[in-house]
Every structure is written in C-alpha cells, then in structure tokens.
C-alpha cells in the first residue's frame, strides 16, 4: 500500500478479498497444467459475480462511483484480463506476470476484446527461461497479448514492462507498479 502511495499521487480505495482455493476461484476454464482438480475452471464466474454484485455495490455505497481497476499477480492477473473481457465494469487492468500460458488463452483473447480503457502487463525477464514446456511460452503469450491490446486500445493506454528476475520475487512491488500505472492513466 505504501509503495502504491509513493508511485501515484492519486487518492484511492483498495479492496481485496481472500481466495482460499485460488486456482478454483480464478481460473476461467480447466487446464490440467494448472491443476488436475476437476473443480478448477468452474468458479471464476462465481468470483466475478461476487465482485460485481457484492463487492462493488458496497464500495460504491461507501465511496461513490469511483473508477474501478481490477488486477492481480499470476493467476490474479489472468483472472483480471479475463474479467475485463466479460464485463465493462472495470476501467483498467493491472496484470502483473499474468498466467497467459494456459491452454486456449490466445484464442479466447482474440475473440473477446478487452472492455477496459487501459491495461498494464508485466513479466519477469527470466520467466520464459524456465524448464516447464508450457510455462516457458509465457514470454510469447504476453507479447501477443500486448500486441492484441495495442490494436484494441489507444497505444498509449497499454504497456508491457519487463522486470528483472523470474516469476517469484517482488510480487507486491510489481503489482503496486501495475496499479499505479493504471491509476496515473485514468486520473485525467
């Protein structure tokens, strides 16, 4: 929170919620490479409904109709990009190291334009150099997502930032940078 305050002069309200079964709550569809649990991929719509029908109404009743940025790290970033293609409730997406390597993501993204006005993507510069054959595609997947977003949005309303390191490390800092970039974009 402190880093976010340092990175953006904008006032903000931050709301988070716990997902005990994060893969179940955030995966938009099943992928055995993420989990063999058959429940994975069945509950992202429930999570989105919670945000739209419970969380956002409470926030709006307390703070007014503020712009809403959705974001997260890893599967949270994937969920944010998916959610912002399913509803226009979000003005921006802060996707730090999103898990875009899942099976079927690029076909989905090509068929479903982002409904938010701006999007931040980031990736660690060593993430695509892992041994896992599925996950090592992440660099190409994020570059393709960025190209899609550049075609859909005003070019200045999307960015792809490369961070030093792999997937694990400085997750909070990377996520704060993503949200700050979005906040600075929508403040005007």
Language-model regions, residue ranges each:
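Short helix-capping segments at alpha-helix termini
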Residues: 6-10, 62-63, 88-89, 113, ...
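The feature captures the conserved acid-bearing segment of alpha/beta-hydrolase catalytic domains
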Residues: 99-182
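Alpha/beta-hydrolase-fold serine-hydrolase catalytic core, especially in secreted/extracellular enzymes
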Residues: 31, 36-39, 155-156, 173-174, ...
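A short, hydrophobic beta-strand element of the alpha/beta-hydrolase
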Residues: 94-96
């Amino acid at each position: 929170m402190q880093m976010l305050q340092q990175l953006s002069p904008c006032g903000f309200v931050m709301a988070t919620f716990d997902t005990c079964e994060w893969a179940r709550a955030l995966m938009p569809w099943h992928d055995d490479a993420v989990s063999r649990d058959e429940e994975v991929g069945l509950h992202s719509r429930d999570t989105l409904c919670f945000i739209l029908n419970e969380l956002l109404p409470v926030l709006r009743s307390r703070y007014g109709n503020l712009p809403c940025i959705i974001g997260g790290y890893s599967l949270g970033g994937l969920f944010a990009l998916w959610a912002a293609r399913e509803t226009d409730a979000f003005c921006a997406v802060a996707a730090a190291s999103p898990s875009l390597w899942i099976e079927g993501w690029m076909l989905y993204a090509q068929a479903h334009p982002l409904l938010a006005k701006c999007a931040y993507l980031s990736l660690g510069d060593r993430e695509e150099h892992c041994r896992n054959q599925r996950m090592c595609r992440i660099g190409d997947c994020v570059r393709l997502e960025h190209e899609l977003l550049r075609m859909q949005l005003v070019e200045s309303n999307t960015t792809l930032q490369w961070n030093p390191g792999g997937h694990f490390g400085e997750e909070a800092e990377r996520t704060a940078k993503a949200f700050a970039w979005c906040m600075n974009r929508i403040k005007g």
